[in-house]
Amino acid sequence: MDINSLAHTKWNCKYHIVFAPKYRRKVAYGKIKQDIADILSMLCKRKGVKIIEAEICPDHVHMLVEIPPSISVSYFVGYLKGKSTLMIFERHANLKYKYGNRHFWCRGYYVDTVGKNAKKIQEYIQNQLKNDLEYDQLTLNEYIDPFTGEPVKKGRKK
């Protein structure tokens, strides 16, 4: 267990944070995904937050982070989402048309404290992209008639 310290404080504050683009749109591919990763990493370094594990999926972001006790989680997530939105729109101006001028991320987020199960959460985040791809493959079968094996479009056979 890694224990950090401030002047008169010993701390070990780890959090699993999940947030998504507005309308849960799948936009994090290729160059945009890399830019989001770079931006989030840079913003975390500015605040002294250590990223233990992170995964950017097409429609959401998982982060396992270590936040100093001098920063509240809600402040940090607000800072991360607010600043990253401005920087993403600066690099990818075309996204403003999909999301409006100031809203890239949806309003809410999920946060959970991490105790002794940090390794399990780290593994979960590492496997998240694989799990999403498997789920997408499963949903592809919903559009195939189970009796004939032929594609189905809006309840009708082609």
What are these model-derived regions, one by one?
Residues 1-158:
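Basic nucleic-acid-binding interfaces
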